[in-house]
Amino acid sequence: MFNVESVERVELCESLLTWIQTFNVDAPCQTAEDLTNGVVMSQVLQKIDPVYFDDNWLNRIKTEVGDNWRLKISNLKKILKGILDYNHEILGQQINDFTLPDVNLIGEHSDAAELGRMLQLILGCAVNCEQKQEYIQAIMMMEESVQHVVMTAIQELMSKESPVSAGHDAYVDLDRQLKKTTEELNEALSAKEEIAQRCHELDMQVAALQEEKSSLLAENQILMERLNQSDSIEDPNSPAGRRHLQLQTQLEQLQEETFRLEAAKDDYRIRCEELEKEISELRQQNDELTTLADEAQSLKDEIDVLRHSSDKVSKLEGQVESYKKKLEDLGDLRRQVKLLEEKNTMYMQNTVSLEEELRKANAARGQLETYKRQVVELQNRLSDESKKADKLDFEYKRLKEKVDGLQKEKDRLRTERDSLKETIEELRCVQAQEGQLTTQGLMPLGSQESSDSLAAEIVTPEIREKLIRLQHENKMLKLNQEDSDNEKIALLQSLLDDANLRKNELETENRLVNQRLLEVQSQVEELQKSLQDQGSKAEDSVLLKKKLEEHLEKLHEANNELQKKRAIIEDLEPRFNNSSLRIEELQEALRKKEEEMKQMEERYKKYLEKAKSVIRTLDPKQNQGAAPEIQALKNQLQERDRLFHSLEKEYEKTKSQRDMEEKYIVSAWYNMGMTLHKKAAEDRLASTGSGQSFLARQRQATSTRRSYPGHVQPATAR
């Protein structure tokens, strides 16, 4: 293996500088100092791979650095990092045991040795990229000394490179690689045939030239004999001398052409030998690829088998998950059964308490109806008494007016005040009586004795379920009835209070209007009497007429007010009638609800008696004959237990089978990976042989990188 340490670093730097000049970049690159700022290197890298080293990366390299060595070092660090990342990410290689260039020495002192190492890394990127054939051809066109140094640097760099990773599944690309190799082999064979044809043509040309040469030699000999016989050929003026010069020049031309054809023949022979070697190498590679293809096919079959087994494993896992869900549902059902049993006992206790409350509510409902009737009677009596009181007040005031006419106005105000006070007191009495009635209606009645609890007697689940349903139904009906009764009672109470209040107001206004009307009528009567008594007096007639007109106006105003009050009363009467109709409808609905409650209570009592009779008949001696439903429930529980145990056994079996299949898959995958890794290592060792040419090793390295894109990382790369 070559070692670049035998070559002077200065010579390496100069040779690589000559190679850099072949890229024709914009920046000057005549001396080593021109490369220390990193601008030329960045432009060269962009030409090598413009996709990876794009304009964004190039813009990070500062062009105007001048003599600032810090900016130079910054540019060189960016370039070195880009080269290493390109080798790792794009080329899939990692440089080991290679001394990286010291960018500080390059930037500060323009060190040629470190600059040569940097250019050597750029050279490695060029000969390993996708356009490597161009750059290798450019190297071949350079001088032999420069070419030798560059080739030595390439081989040293290649000896330090190692692939980052090799693929465990390389057999995926073997078919494609085999087709490509077959195409290259066919191209090489066609090129060989063309070269052989060309060699044959050149041999024919050489034979023809040799025959021509022999004929010319014979002719020359004849001419020499003639020359000896004739004049001296040294005289150029003589015809023989001129002919001699002409033949001599023609002979020299033929000799040069012969030498040129022989050199071309040797070159073609060497090229033919190289192509034969390449054909043999390609055949060997073809054989290796066919073996790899067979191995890949066998591995594909194994993978199909493993995939089928993995599908079975996934199905079994799905079944196990469904069994787990069923087991969880079974546990939930058991917990629900326990909760329902607890609720059953609680509902039975609530049933007894609700029966007691129902009895109390029935008793309170009867008392409430009696109180309502008493309230209506008292209101009627109150209205009658108020009318009588109004009449008595009116008579009292009339007599008092006759006695004392001067204090008429004062007495009238006093009577009005007294009447208002009486009305307020009456209203207060009515409100106090109504409040007392409502409080008496809502007072709790005496509690009765609770019925016997049946929690200890209920045994079977069906009886418990029936009782639970009945209790829930009873509870919902009671709640609905209580809510509806409370709402209706509150609504009726509010409507009744509003109606009573409005009625009292209207009665008060009506009473006042009647009093005013009676007063006006009495005044009219008095005026008429006084007019009849004093009809003879002419001077008082005008005054009497005025008084009469005033009293008539007052009477008219009172009649108008009375008509307005009557209209208001007539407007309010339909509302009062509607509210009374609504109250009657609500009372009728309440009565229907009470009848429904009675029916529900009767049904509940029947069900309760039936449950008690069933419980009494459940004697322990007759359980087997009289309780087939209990036996059916027991059978169902036993069947569920058996199903549970069978599911557990099947789950354990599938779990052990899945564990074994996972172990088999892991072992097969490990063996396949080891085989491919060993094969890749042998290929790499075979590709580094010293007997092959540089171009052959380059092709093998490229095919290895394409075939094994990478999962296994060698120990040197770690």
Curated annotation (Swiss-Prot):
Expressed in brain, cerebellum, heart, intestine, kidney, liver, lung, skeletal muscle, spleen and stomach (at protein level). One of its GO terms (cellular component) is HOPS complex. Keywords: Acetylation, Coiled coil, Cytoplasm, Cytoskeleton, Golgi apparatus, Microtubule, Phosphoprotein, Protein transport, Transport. Signal peptide: none annotated. It holds the Pfam family HOOK. It is found in: Cytoplasm, Cytoskeleton; Golgi apparatus. The modification N-acetylmethionine is found at residue 1. Acts as an adapter protein linking the dynein motor complex to various cargos and converts dynein from a non-processive to a highly processive motor in the presence of dynactin. Facilitates the interaction between dynein and dynactin and activates dynein processivity (the ability to move along a microtubule for a long distance without falling off the track). Predominantly recruits 2 dyneins, which increases both the force and speed of the microtubule motor. Component of the FTS/Hook/FHIP complex (FHF complex). This is Protein Hook homolog 3.
